[in-house]
Amino acid sequence: MVSRKAVVVLLVVHAAAMLASHTEAFVPIFTYGELQRMQEKERNKGQKKSLSVQQASEELGPLDPSEPTKEEERVVIKLLAPVDIGIRMDSRQLEKYRATLERLLGQAPQSTQNQNAAK
């Protein structure tokens, strides 16, 4: 028969395995003090950035509100960049969504033509 020590060891190992499987296994890499120092450094960086932005805006003077800034122009360019979209369907899905796809594809050239006419 199995000794009591072996049974106890197996029970302890089993309990440890159960606890380990239910935890998120978070192991802190940094100490609490190190985390506080890093957060303080990040706050200082944020303050320096906001200060430099404020100084730059003071140097430029008042801007015309209707005139976009360089950052806004970059955002607009990124939003207007063409995007290719691909869809993979099997024959059953194609049969099911054929009417909707034909309607969408019929509308796509119209919206493209409207954008070109506006320019």
Curated annotation (Swiss-Prot):
Ranges for region Disordered: 40-72
GO MF annotations in UniProt: hormone activity; motilin receptor binding
Keywords: Cleavage on pair of basic residues, Hormone, Secreted, Signal
Domain of life: Eukaryota
Protein localization: Secreted
GO CC term (a single one): extracellular region
Signal peptide positions on this chain: 1-25
InterPro entries registered for this protein in UniProt: Motilin_assoc, Motilin_ghrelin, Promotilin
Protein purpose: Plays an important role in the regulation of interdigestive gastrointestinal motility and indirectly causes rhythmic contraction of duodenal and colonic smooth muscle.
Family in the record: Belongs to the motilin family.
Stated name of the protein: Promotilin
Organism: Sus scrofa
GN (gene name): MLN
